[in-house]
């Protein structure tokens, strides 16, 4: 097949896909909208193994909601945000979602937490015609569109996707370090499997043989067996498909064994708490990230004001998780405002798919969606812990 013919076939396939998605009948809901308010909901881990993420995300969402409402709301309507605690338990997330949709009558589900918890409840959200916006998981199921499933058009994500971000970060590290035996330790769930996919795909693309692949159960606290195995196998680069405490735990075990090896974390490791709690143990850790992590003593302008105000409101240091929660509400408000005074589910969907860009004050890549693309961006950074702080090494990376 000639290149010209091949490109024509590809273009035709894209057009067919776009037409199928655009013309499929999508059920949308108008529940939760009154003359005075818009009801939105979320489920977070406020009491479970990743509550360090959940509490901060919830705080960021509350802060943005208060600011939007103080400025007059969205075309005169105030946001009413309802937050439920899933404890990072898929069964509880399902119950929370049913309550939010059936009892509270939420218009949108925004910023829901975690791959296994979001996955367990996603069909409930979409089947009800409720938009699922900007969940705290970058797994493919949160943005990948299936033309045979019209309700897929109700899901959007604005985080760097796990597979693509892992591939970009691995490409950077392989070119930087030239490892002979790159290995991976990952959480045994949708998140970890996406990171594993990115790891395997990028090594295959670069013709590098993968080393040990070892997993752990969600909620685990002992990683001695995994670390000992990778050390014995001669791994010279370790990708961590972990969150916060697992990252610190894995690197602590490596230090106990006197094992000096380069660690690269997937995007959920790129948070302030890792160097704050891990201290010297995590010094030198690399990670894929979406935004430069701001620090109060070096931040400027609106970002510095935001950091100061967050600390006043919640009595705790701001972090990346809070920024993500804040931006989830701000992004929703941007597109809901664009949808106009006569807000409906269909008009919100049209606004989201319009191609208009939302720009975060925190410097994340612009969020932009279309009828055939419900992922805001795939560009990432690679950062490293240096002297107890995350430092950007390279930005605008893609594989």
Model-derived segments and their meaning:
Residues 28-62, 84-91, 113-114, 185-194, ...:
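Extracytoplasmic "Venus flytrap"
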Residues 46-49, 86-91, 114-119, 137-142, ...:
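Solvent-exposed loop/turn segments at secondary-structure junctions
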């Amino acid at each position: 097949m000639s290149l010209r013919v091949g490109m024509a076939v590809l273009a035709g396939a894209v057009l067919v896909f776009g037409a199928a998605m655009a013309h499929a009948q999508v059920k949308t809901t108008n529940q939760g909208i009154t003359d005075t308010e818009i009801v939105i909901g979320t489920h977070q881990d406020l009491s479970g193994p990743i509550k360090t993420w959940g509490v901060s995300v919830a705080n960021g969402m509350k802060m943005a909601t208060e600011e939007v409402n103080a400025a007059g709301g969205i075309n005169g309507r105030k946001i009413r945000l309802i937050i439920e605690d899933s404890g990072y338990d898929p069964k509880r997330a399902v119950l929370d979602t049913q309550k939010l949709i059936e009892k509270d009558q939420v218009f949108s589900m925004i910023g829901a937490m975690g791959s296994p918890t979001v996955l367990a409840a996603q069909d409930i959200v979409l089947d009800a015609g409720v938009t699922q916006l900007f969940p705290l998981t970058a797994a493919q199921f949160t943005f990948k569109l299936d033309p045979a499933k019209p309700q897929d058009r109700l899901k959007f994500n604005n985080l760097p996707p796990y597979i693509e971000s892992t591939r970009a970060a691995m490409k950077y590290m392989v070119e930087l370090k030239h490892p002979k035996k790159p290995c991976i330790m990952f959480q045994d769930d949708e998140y970890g499997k996406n990171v594993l996919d990115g790891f395997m795909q990028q090594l295959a693309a670069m013709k590098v043989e993968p080393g040990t692949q070892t997993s752990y159960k969600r909620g685990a606290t002992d990683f001695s067996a995994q670390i000992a195995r990778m050390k014995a196998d001669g791994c010279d680069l370790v990708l961590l498909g972990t969150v916060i405490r697992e990252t610190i735990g894995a690197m602590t075990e490596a230090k106990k064994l006197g094992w000096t090896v380069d660690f690269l974390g997937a995007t959920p490791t790129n948070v302030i708490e890792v160097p704050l709690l891990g201290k010297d143990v995590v010094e030198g850790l690399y990670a894929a990230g979406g935004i430069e992590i701001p620090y109060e003593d070096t931040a400027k302008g609106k970002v510095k004001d935001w950091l100061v105000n967050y600390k006043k409101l919640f009595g705790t240091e701001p972090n990346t998780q809070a920024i993500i929660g804040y931006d989830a509400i701000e992004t929703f408000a941007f597109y809901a405002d664009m949808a106009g005074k006569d807000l409906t589910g269909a008009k919100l969907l049209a606004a989201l798919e319009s191609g208009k860009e939302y720009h975060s004050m925190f410097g994340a890549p612009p969020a932009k969606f279309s009828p055939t693309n419900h992922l805001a961006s795939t560009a990432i950074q690679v950062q490293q812990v240096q002297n107890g702080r995350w430092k950007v090494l390279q930005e605008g990376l893609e594989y």
